[in-house]
């Protein structure tokens, strides 16, 4: 694919141009993008004209920084690409839990059956979210099913938000209790089967989760 000034803007961002002013030369940038120094000069002028960068000349080269408008442009581009590539998709790695999932799934099992329509395997599959950044980012546009809390033997169990998902054609749900000890990078998944055994998963395996 033919290079453009967008490639240059991304290169400047990766070089630290968002956080600080960076010193570079057209020759150095031309080698990195495999274009002529004259092309780099023209692209820098175009980016400056569009308000995406600020630049000034020094004896050692060109000082460049990405403007606030440039940062907003890159953020918007990132959002649009993410939406196009990963719409409804969560990428994560299987991790071990602390062993409490089975207890809580058993307590909520009748309500899971009522609200989600399946008898859950007594345990959860824990997944560390790689993309998007957190489980909350992944589910922000998905409507949850609220499993109501209850009291049992003097103990209170809070509401749980459940989000229907599919992993390798097995339907289940990501569950987020109103009280949780897990960081926002961890997704707890319930299903009618033992997902680890059924899908032959081990810690570190990467999986793709589709929201429904």
Curated annotation (Swiss-Prot):
FMN binds at residues 180, 188. Binds 1 Mg(2+) ion per subunit. Residues 1-87 are annotated as: H-T-H motif-like. It catalyses: riboflavin + CTP = CDP + FMN + H(+). Pathway: Cofactor biosynthesis; FMN biosynthesis; FMN from riboflavin (CTP route): step 1/1. Mg(2+) binds at residues 124, 126. It is an enzyme of class 2 (transferase). InterPro entries: HTH_MarR-typ, RibK_CTP-dep, Riboflavin_kinase_archaeal, Riboflavin_kinase_CTP-dep, Riboflavin_kinase_dom_sf, WH-like_DNA-bd_sf, WH_DNA-bd_sf. CDP binds at residues 97-102, 193-196. Keywords: Flavoprotein, FMN, Kinase, Magnesium, Metal-binding, Nucleotide-binding, Transferase. GO terms for molecular function: DNA-binding transcription factor activity; magnesium ion binding; nucleotide binding; riboflavin kinase activity. Its cofactor is Mg(2+). Residues 88-212 are annotated as: Riboflavin kinase. One of its GO terms (biological process) is riboflavin biosynthetic process. Its EC number is 2.7.1.161. Pfam families: CTP-dep_RFKase, HTH_29. PANTHER family: RIBOFLAVIN KINASE (PTHR40706:SF1). Belongs to the archaeal riboflavin kinase family. Catalyzes the CTP-dependent phosphorylation of riboflavin (vitamin B2) to form flavin mononucleotide (FMN). This is Riboflavin kinase. It comes from Pyrococcus furiosus (strain ATCC 43587 / DSM 3638 / JCM 8422 / Vc1).
